[in-house]
From Swiss-Prot:
Annotated Pfam families: Phycobilisome
The entry's keywords: Antenna complex, Bile pigment, Chromophore, Electron transport, Membrane, Methylation, Photosynthesis, Phycobilisome, Thylakoid, Transport
Organism (species): Pseudanabaena tenuis (strain PCC 7409)
Topology relative to the membrane: Peripheral membrane protein
The name this protein goes by in its record: C-phycoerythrin beta chain
Subunit structure: Heterodimer of an alpha and a beta chain.
Primary location: membrane
Similarity comment text for this entry: Belongs to the phycobiliprotein family.
Length: 185
């Protein structure tokens, strides 16, 4: 079962029959709380568009995916791809909020490559969709996504993240997407 930073500190201390000693790590986690919430909000507020843009991106790069015999044909396969991409994004946000990848690893990535292989889902297209999703999410966290880039789909964040404060959160989010890519490779 995935543990948040506090539960992990208590379990670790209990296992060594000592008091919680990693107070500095807990302080740092608490201090990053608002940044995490802002980052997750930036992703969640744009999730639907991010998912559809990631899938549209792989279709633009490979029109064969939506042709008869392609992996996004017929519509039920396309819908399943959108659903799976949304699930991946959702678990990345859970990991980002918790500051821990175990929920992502345990609930989304464990056996993902094998499942996709058994279903005949091309991992190269899936990896490319996750790469696009990563770029979109990081742009929203950093506030570098603009109306000019996103067009009518653009949703401005209510609370823009301060550039120097969001670099570590953006890097952490990118790392969770990289875990997804590694699990599919």
């Amino acid at each position: 079962m995935p543990l948040d930073a506090f539960s992990r500190a208590v379990v670790t201390a209990d296992a060594s029959t000592s008091v919680v000693s990693d107070i500095n790590a807990l302080k740092a986690f608490v201090a990053s709380g608002n940044r995490r919430l802002d980052a997750v909000n930036a992703i969640a507020s744009n999730a639907s568009c991010a998912v559809s843009d990631a899938i549209a991106g792989i279709v633009c790069e490979n029109q064969g995916l939506i042709q008869a015999g392609g992996n996004l044909y017929p519509n039920r396969r396309f819908a399943a791809c959108l659903r799976d991409t949304e699930i991946i994004l959702r678990y990345v946000t859970y990991a980002l909020l918790a500051g821990d990848s175990s929920v992502l690893d345990d609930r989304a990535l464990n056996g993902l490559k094998e499942t996709y292989s058994a279903l005949g889902v091309p991992t190269t297209s899936t990896i490319r969709a996750v790469q696009i999703l990563k770029a979109i999410a990081v742009a929203h966290i950093q506030g570098t996504n603009t109306e000019a880039r996103a067009g009518a789909k653009y949703r401005k964040n209510e609370t823009p993240l301060v550039e120097d404060r969001c670099a570590s959160i953006a890097a952490e989010a990118a790392g969770y997407f990289d875990r997804v890519i590694a699990a599919l490779s």
